A protein has these predicted regions:
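A hydrophobic alpha-helical transmembrane-helix feature that marks the membrane cores
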Residues: 1-250
Length: 250
């Protein structure tokens, strides 16, 4: 279970937890759709603010507030899965505020060079999720312990990359080649998008195994939350990749 949200400790502890019902794949799917709807509500608000405000910077408090608030709520849910039934919708709205703001910024920045970049990123994210679900259902890729360990290494490497580039940028180190539209930067983004996509297989596997094990009903919200974390990450990376492709063409 390479998704940090879906830790083995959480899985074991919830299987024996007392609850009024048991987790099902169908129930998790419904709750995932609810969270997607909540994300859209938050995103539409900050998108509206970004496009209607006299000062475009007015969207930043909402955007950064959503990002920070979403991170805090995600951490709480990760340590307290039973709270997911209450906090997952809040997380979705907060992430929506962030995604709506950042999407509006990209849309405005690439209005000429890549019109429709946000819609394309959204469609590609949805298409990727559907394809990975079909791959999982067809068992084309064996999702086992070995696969999970490989994904954990890949995820850890990406996290290290994120942190190291952030720290180096704080010290004024020039990292243009990692963030411009050059081959190296695009290659890195492609790898990260690929890892994010394969993470969905682990999310699907967790949801299926937890349902089979009779996990408590609230774990449907937890499973939907974990899936949403991956989808948000995937969308952001695809959006950034499309922006790099647009810059490369120009």
């Amino acid at each position: 279970m390479a998704n940090p949200v879906f830790s083995e400790k959480v899985f074991r502890s919830t299987v024996t937890a007392k609850d009024t019902g048991v987790m099902t794949v169908g129930g998790t799917a419904i709750k995932s759709l609810v969270l997607i709807f909540m994300v859209l509500i938050g995103a539409m608000y900050t998108w509206k603010v970004a496009y209607e405000a006299i000062n475009p910077a007015s969207v930043q408090p909402w955007m950064y507030g959503g990002a920070i608030g979403g991170f805090v709520v995600a951490m709480i849910i990760s340590f307290k899965p039973i709270w997911a039934q209450y906090l997952a919708p809040i997380y979705a709205v907060l992430e929506g505020l962030f995604l709506g703001g950042i999407s509006a910024i990209f849309s405005q920045a690439f209005a000429t060079t890549a019109p429709g970049i946000v819609m394309n990123a959204t469609l590609l994210t949805m298409l990727t999720a559907v394809v990975m679900l079909l791959i999982y259902r067809a068992k084309i890729i064996k999702v086992d312990g070995k696969f999970a360990r490989i994904m954990m290494i890949a995820l850890g490497t990406i996290m290290l990359y994120y942190i190291s580039t952030w720290i180096l940028s704080m010290f004024g180190v020039n990292l243009t080649m990692l963030h411009n539209s050059g081959p190296l930067s695009i290659g890195i983004s492609l790898v990260i998008v690929g890892v994010a996509a394969f993470m969905l297989l682990l999310d699907f596997n967790f949801i299926e195994k937890a349902s089979e094990a009779g996990a408590p009903k609230y774990m449907e919200w937890y499973g939907a939350f974990g899936l949403m974390v991956t989808l948000v990450w995937l969308y952001l990376e695809i959006l950034q990749l499309l922006a790099k492709f647009a810059g490369n063409r120009n």
